[in-house]
């Protein structure tokens, strides 16, 4: 992250100050909402192509050979959502884990995050780096989908007072059934694959 900030200058760019942050409970429709917005072409989100160095999107873009999007494949959730290398995803959580992980991740729960000016400035740089790595850094808006954003709404609003925060709600019975199905599905996977348990 520090190397990215030293190497890639943001001077001369007029970045948009009105990103969109999507948050909500798991299985509430946040992924589909993000994808619909991303498909308008007006937003920059981190995608699978930014992996594994999501804190250095510009440096990784220079060093890696950008592959074509490739064929669409169903994601691990087996919920009918198809993904490719160009699909947006909630990779922003890496930033929060690295810079504030010990403040909100507990063994038995997650905790609301108190704002910290130094981290707030780093987050603004993180968003600008993501925009800078796009083909139209001065035109696109940053788009984030992260269910854990609910823990840091104060950060988001202090970082970007003009931001829009969207929290979708789903029919409670459908929502509960979807959560149960995913719990059963991933419990089976994690029983067979320890890496999956650590990753999730």
Predicted regions and their residues:
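A conserved segment at the C-terminal end of the G1
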Residues: 31-44
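Hydrophobic anchor at the beta1->P-loop junction of P-loop NTPases
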Residues: 22
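Extreme N-terminal, non-catalytic leader segments
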Residues: 1-19
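PAPS-dependent sulfation machinery
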Residues: 49-142
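Conserved phosphate-donor/acceptor-positioning beta-strand/loop module used by diverse small-molecule
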Residues: 145-147, 156-181
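PAPS-dependent sulfotransferase catalytic core
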Residues: 181-200
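P-loop (Walker A) phosphate-binding loop of NTP-binding proteins
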Residues: 25
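Short catalytic/ligand-binding loop motif for oxyanion handling, primarily in non-cytosolic enzymes
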Residues: 29-31, 52-55, 151-153, 173-178
């Amino acid at each position: 992250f520090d190397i990215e900030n030293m190497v890639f200058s943001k001077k001369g760019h007029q970045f948009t100050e009105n990103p969109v942050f999507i948050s909500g409970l798991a299985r509430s429709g946040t992924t589909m909402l993000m994808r619909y917005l991303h498909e308008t072409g007006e937003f920059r989100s981190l995608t699978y192509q930014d992996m594994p160095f999501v804190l250095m999107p510009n440096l990784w873009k220079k060093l890696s050979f950008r592959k074509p999007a490739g064929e669409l494949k169903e994601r691990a959730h087996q919920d009918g959502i198809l993904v490719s290398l160009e699909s947006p995803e909630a990779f922003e959580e890496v930033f929060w884990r690295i810079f504030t992980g010990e403040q909100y991740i507990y063994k038995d729960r997650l905790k609301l995050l108190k704002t910290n000016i130094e981290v707030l400035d780093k987050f603004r740089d993180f968003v600008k780096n993501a925009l800078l790595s796009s083909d139209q850094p001065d035109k696109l808006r940053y788009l984030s989908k992260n269910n854990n954003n609910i823990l840091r709404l104060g950060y988001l609003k202090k970082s970007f007072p003009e931001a829009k925060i969207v929290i979708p709600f789903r029919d409670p019975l459908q929502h509960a059934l979807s959560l149960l199905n995913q719990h059963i599905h991933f419990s089976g996977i994690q029983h067979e694959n320890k890496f999956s348990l650590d990753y999730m």
